[in-house]
């Protein structure tokens, strides 16, 4: 496996000026796009995506399928002049491999996971929030934070990360994946070292062991039709209580042990490995 050696962690890299009218026009256009739910197993709720740049030029090819050469603008990307202009000003497009719109729908929660496990190479991931709210929270390992429109964020996708949306609209981000030897190489200008400022961080309450035990006891109600509802509650608990990504799966597995249908919930124990440790390509 080729690994990008940059010893960086998730954090804000800087800000960029946003043309509010240009962005609003593109957001209106995005609202009419078709989207794929290719990664639906990674979300409780809905995480819709489409490609703005990829290797095929097809907007509904939103996966990370390997290919040679730089990315091309897709049929959907051709309809987003402001987004293309903004990305072209900020980044070296010759190193871009994938550019996707990611829309996290109201009330949804991403399963804590690590990316690139199924690939032969690690990529460098950048997030540009396009439409969001303070009630949309992301996580990097055990740190919670919020990203604002006009900010440029590096996401260390090799580390456990998640997100929840408590907003009434879709949280929309542009997610860019670069194949480069360093983070700095992806940009046309200078960028600061990534960090998560304290002003962006979100506090959690200490773990209450009785609350966690009560969640597990509620597993008596779990069956094959609702185990992902339990998963969603466990994920959202990570955004209010001081538990780890591993702790989310501890809660789910603990609840499953209380279920009368435990023997039929054999899909639960492999989930920790699939999301956090290893996936086949």
What is each model feature region?
Residues 124-129, 152-154, 168-186:
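A short hydrophobic beta-strand segment most commonly corresponding to one strand
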Residues 175-233:
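Charged, amphipathic alpha-helical linkers/stalks
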């Amino acid at each position: 496996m080729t690994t990008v050696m940059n010893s960086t962690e998730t954090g804000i890299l800087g800000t960029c000026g946003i043309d509010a009218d240009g962005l609003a026009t593109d957001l209106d256009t995005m609202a009419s796009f078709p989207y794929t739910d290719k990664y639906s197993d990674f979300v409780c709720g809905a995480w819709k995506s489409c490609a703005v740049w990829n290797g095929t030029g097809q907007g509904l090819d939103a996966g990370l399928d390997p290919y040679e050469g730089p990315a091309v603008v897709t049929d959907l990307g051709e309809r987003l002049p402001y987004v293309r202009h903004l990305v072209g000003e900020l980044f070296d497009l010759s190193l871009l491999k994938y550019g996707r719109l990611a829309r996290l729908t109201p009330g949804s929660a991403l399963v804590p996971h690590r990316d690139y496990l199924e690939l032969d190479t690690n990529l460098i991931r950048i997030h540009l929030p396009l439409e969001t709210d303070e009630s949309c929270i992301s996580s990097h390992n055990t740190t919670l934070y919020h990203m604002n429109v006009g900010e440029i964020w590096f996401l260390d996708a090799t580390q456990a990360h998640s997100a929840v949306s408590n907003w009434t609209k879709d949280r929309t981000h542009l997610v860019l994946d670069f194949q480069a030897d360093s983070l700095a190489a992806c940009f046309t200008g200078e960028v600061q070292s990534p960090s998560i400022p304290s002003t962006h961080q979100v506090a959690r309450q200490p773990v209450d062991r009785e609350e966690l035990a009560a969640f597990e006891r509620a597993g008596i109600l779990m069956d094959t039709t609702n185990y992902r509802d339990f998963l969603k509650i466990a994920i959202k608990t990570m955004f209010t209580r001081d538990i780890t990504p591993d702790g989310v799966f501890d809660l789910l597995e603990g609840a499953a042990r209380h279920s009368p249908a435990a023997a039929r919930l054999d899909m639960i124990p492999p989930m920790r490995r699939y999301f956090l440790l290893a996936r086949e390509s």
